[in-house]
Amino acid sequence: MTENTPGTSAPERFDPATADTRWQRVWDEKQSFRADDSSTKPRSYVLEMFPYPSGRIHIGHVRNYTMGDVLARYKRMRGFEVLHPMGWDAFGMPAENAAMEKGVHPGGWTRDNIANMKAQLKRLGFALDWSREIATCEPEYYGQEQALFLDLYAAGLVYRKESTVNWDPVDMTVLANEQVIDGRGWRSGALVEKRKLNQWFLKITDFADELLEGLSTLDKWPEKVRVMQENWIGKSQGLQFRFDLSNGETVEVYTTRPDTIFGASFVAVAPDHPIAQGVAAINCEAANFIALCKKGGTTAAELETAEKLGFDTGIGARHPLTGKYLPVYIANFVLMEYGTGAIMAVPGHDQRDFDFATKYALPILRVVAADAADADKPFAGEAEAGDGVLVNSGFLDGMNVADAKAAVIVRAESEGWGEGKTVWRLRDWGVSRQRYWGTPIPFIHCEVCGVVPVPKKHLPVTLPEDVSFDVPGNPLDRHPTWKHVDCPQCGHPARRETDTLDTFVDSSWYFLRFASQPEDRPFDPEEIKRWLPVEQYIGGIEHAILHLLYARFWTRALARIGKVEVTEPFGSLFTQGMVTHETYERRNPENGQPIFFSPGEVERTGEGATLKVDGAPVEIGRVIKMSKSKKNVVDPDEIVAKYGADAIRWFMLSDSPPERDLPWSEAGIEGCARFVQRLWRLFGQYDAAATGEDKALDRKAHQTVHAVASDIEALGFNKAVARIYELTGAVEKAAPSASRSDAIRKLLLLVAPMMPHLAEEAYARFGSSLIADAAWPEVDPALLVDDEVIVAVQVKGKLRDTLTVAKGTPKEDLERLALASEKVQRALEGAEVKKVIVVPDRLVNLVA
């Protein structure tokens, strides 16, 4: 920076509209944020989860991308070669829904939305490398995905089988268990049905141990996310054993609590278990019950909370230790996909079994108690799942739970009726989807050769453009020509696979394509080695299981087949909070239902609010997540147009810790806009010719630079904002001096990652370079240590005065200064000081 001259004097007010447009154009022209693969600088890969192109950026996106942008800009200032890309998770059902509702092609609808959202992102001034932009709906991307899918197939990690699936009868597609919410499709809301279809699967279960053990290395991930993945993978160790049945058959069950085997009072099988199906074949009531079960929830979480229903098959299961016969039920809460599809039910020590036994008047036996004397203690209306000692359990009596588990497994294995076994909750990933707008699965079905992979030289298998969405279902299946093709092996007429890949496949490797984009292969392994893992990944907690687990699996699968060396894609993960807003509503006088109004329709009046059109009051509701249905949304474009990009960026970083929800406030954004102007005025006071020293301000400035750097690196943006406010106030109060001008310069550099347009506009008055290319201010380590400290003085435990003294002042001097204080003497009221406790540099406590 050079001295401000009359020729470079600043206008009185900062004009966001002009500055935003100017500097965004300059950054584009100079390609300021394009990552250089040939750079020798240390590398930093900052990535926010890429959005689905719905057509509009919402305020939650702004918060997410602002956080990543601040970190990316900061890393550039610290000398890193930064990769900060953006793209579009562009396949999926909403585009097909739009095609059906509006008569537009999914591709055109999606690309128009991308153009709109890209323009919105640019207006916010994000330091993105647009040269690496990808859209998963483009053949350049999904063709490489098809190649990777074939590589995994060749390695035995992709297979096809008939399986029971969750079928959405409205969207007419298969849903993963995670996409079924309360028994309904996550997009359509339709009740999900069970069907059997031939499906393509990825063998994620081959990586269950790796994925579980790998969580222990992710110490920069939120504990909550790691626990969620651990539970989803669901490793359990227990006993698998056989019950001999009264009809001459046997049933295998799996239990994680073999210690409670003497407490079993019934056996339950899943509705689609072979025993259940056999009973249904000869019993209409059983068949009707199974049909009823298929209409209910399909996930473990849903079945856990649903009413427990059962059907007595009339079959008995002989207990392997007591010889008694237990009734066998078909139960709606047993999943065929977990364990063996049959369970040993112990009502006394499992709440689900307790509820079922209570409903059907089955015995509830106590086999674990806090003390042996409690063997006959009745249950207090619920199961007891805690630890204790074994009771009413024959040879297990008196053992603790762990020893009893081991003893039962030893007994079962020695007598040949069971064996210890590890079971996983995780299931192979079904990736077939019966829809058009997705990546075509690159296989051909030939009556002579069977299932044949498409040769890589014929990739990409592209989607046909001439499709119709007049009726639900998969247009690819109905297409008159696209699916008809000659077999690449024998030349006979064959047909293409008409299923497309689950869109979560697209987002399971996009971070690799951002890092390297050769035309002839998915990526260059050497570039992946240099850029990966992503240093900082930012996105919502809602992706803890689906996207994040699948991305971890995909990376490990590619590592196993030698495509990459990295095994964990994201070194550090941050899950940001939502942006929330109060609702405004009235009750419909006819039906009592709420009628919601947008913030723009409402006028706030003190503690209340009125509707602008009629002046009548509206009810101010709770502060909740912004949603279109509640109309409590704020349009980022309107905010940028009114206040400028820097004001909304600053608001997103202020007040709330970034992992917590951020309540939107009109007063808050107005305050941010005022602070932008306040800084502008302060930057205009820089004077390179100023002389004189202000040691306290020097120390404050250097300490703030150091602290803000630490805050940004820890993603503690609200703390960084608070420190910048403090330094701003200190500089404003300081008299003109060289120290003050230096502090102004440092302050300008500090806000550059957060308010880049304001910073560029101010920086331009002092030279020709961009602040986007400037270095982070240096700090003097000697100034990071305070020479003076404030020591609290207490009398009888209450604060009465403070002493500002040199650091390291001896105890005797602190005691003398404390006793000399007039405030202390007044507090003592002439009483004799019996004891003085001194904590150097912190506290003097006088006991009278």
From Swiss-Prot:
Entry keywords, A to Z: Aminoacyl-tRNA synthetase, ATP-binding, Cytoplasm, Ligase, Nucleotide-binding, Protein biosynthesis
Segments of this protein annotated with the region Disordered: 1-21
Motif ('HIGH' region): 51-61
Motif mapping: 'KMSKS' region: 625-629
Record GO cellular component, one term: cytosol
Top-level taxon of origin: Bacteria
Gene Ontology biological process terms in this record: leucyl-tRNA aminoacylation
Any one GO molecular-function label of the UniProt entry: ATP binding
Compartments in which it is found: Cytoplasm
Keyword Nucleus recorded: no
Binding of ATP, residues: 628
InterPro entries, sorted: aa-tRNA-synth_I_CS, aa-tRNA-synth_Ia, Leu-tRNA-ligase, Leu_tRNA-synth_edit, M/V/L/I-tRNA-synth_anticd-bd, Methionyl/Leucyl_tRNA_Synth, Rossmann-like_a/b/a_fold, tRNAsynth_Ia_anticodon-bd
Enzyme class: ligase
Catalysis: reaction(s): tRNA(Leu) + L-leucine + ATP = L-leucyl-tRNA(Leu) + AMP + diphosphate
EC number(s) recorded for this UniProt protein: 6.1.1.4
Family: Belongs to the class-I aminoacyl-tRNA synthetase family.
PANTHER family associated with the record: LEUCINE--TRNA LIGASE, MITOCHONDRIAL, LEUCYL-TRNA SYNTHETASE
Name by which UniProt lists this protein: Leucine--tRNA ligase
Taxonomic source organism: Novosphingobium aromaticivorans (strain ATCC 700278 / DSM 12444 / CCUG 56034 / CIP 105152 / NBRC 16084 / F199)
